[in-house]
Regions:
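Structured interaction patches on ligand/partner-binding surfaces of diverse proteins
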Residues: 89-90, 111-134
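Bacterial signal peptide processing site
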Residues: 14-17
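Disulfide-braced loops of extracellular cysteine-rich modules
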Residues: 21-33
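A short, Gly/Thr-enriched small/hydrophobic beta-strand-prone motif that recurs across taxa
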Residues: 42-61, 133-134
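C-terminal motif of bacterial Sec signal peptides marking the signal peptidase cleavage site
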Residues: 10-12
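Short, ordered, surface-exposed loop/turn motifs in non-cytosolic proteins
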Residues: 57-82
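A short, solvent-exposed beta-strand micro-motif common in secreted/extracellular proteins
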Residues: 94-98, 102-114
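Short, disulfide-bonded extracellular cysteine-rich repeat modules
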Residues: 32-43
Length: 134
C-alpha cells in the first residue's frame, strides 16, 4: 500500500532536479538556472557571448546586407550533435548577444543560405567576430 501511495505521488513532484528541460529559472532547483538551450545548469557554467559581424570591413546596414538580409546563428561544443541556434537573425543588427549560454558551447556558426557558412571560436572575453565577404 505504501508503494502504491509513493507511486501516486511521484508524478506530482516537480521536474527541477537538474539537467532537465526548462523554460524559466523557476523550473530548475538547487540554485540552478535555465540556460538558453533550455537545460537546468549551475550559473557558473554559463556566460554571455556577443557575436559581431561586418561585411567587407563595413558596418552592417541596408546597403551591405542587401544580398543577405537574414542569417542563422548556431552554437556548438566539442560534440557536434550538441548544438542549438536561432534564425532568422537580421544582418542589419551587426551583432547578436546571448546570455546564459552554457560554457561548453565554445564555437559560433554564422551563415546565410547560399552565401556563406563560417565558424569562429568564442574568445576569453566572450566574443566571436566575423568579417563577411560581400
Amino acid at each position: 500500500m505504501r508503494l502504491l501511495a509513493l507511486l501516486l505521488l511521484i508524478p506530482a513532484c516537480p521536474q527541477g532536479t537538474g539537467n532537465g528541460y526548462c523554460e524559466q529559472d523557476t523550473d530548475c532547483s538547487g540554485g540552478q538556472i535555465c540556460a538558453r538551450d533550455m537545460e537546468c545548469i549551475a550559473p557558473g557554467d554559463t556566460r554571455g557571448v556577443k557575436t559581431t559581424w561586418t561585411i567587407g570591413g563595413q558596418a552592417a546596414d541596408a546597403t551591405t546586407c542587401a544580398t543577405m538580409p537574414n542569417f542563422y546563428i548556431n552554437f556548438y561544443g566539442a560534440d557536434p550533435q550538441d548544438a542549438f541556434g536561432f534564425a532568422p537573425v537580421p544582418c542589419m543588427q551587426g551583432q547578436f548577444f546571448i546570455d546564459k549560454l552554457p560554457t561548453r558551447f565554445d564555437q559560433v556558426e554564422l551563415g546565410s543560405d547560399g552565401h556563406f557558412d563560417l565558424v569562429r571560436r568564442v574568445d576569453a572575453s566572450g566574443m566571436a567576430s566575423f568579417d563577411l565577404s560581400p
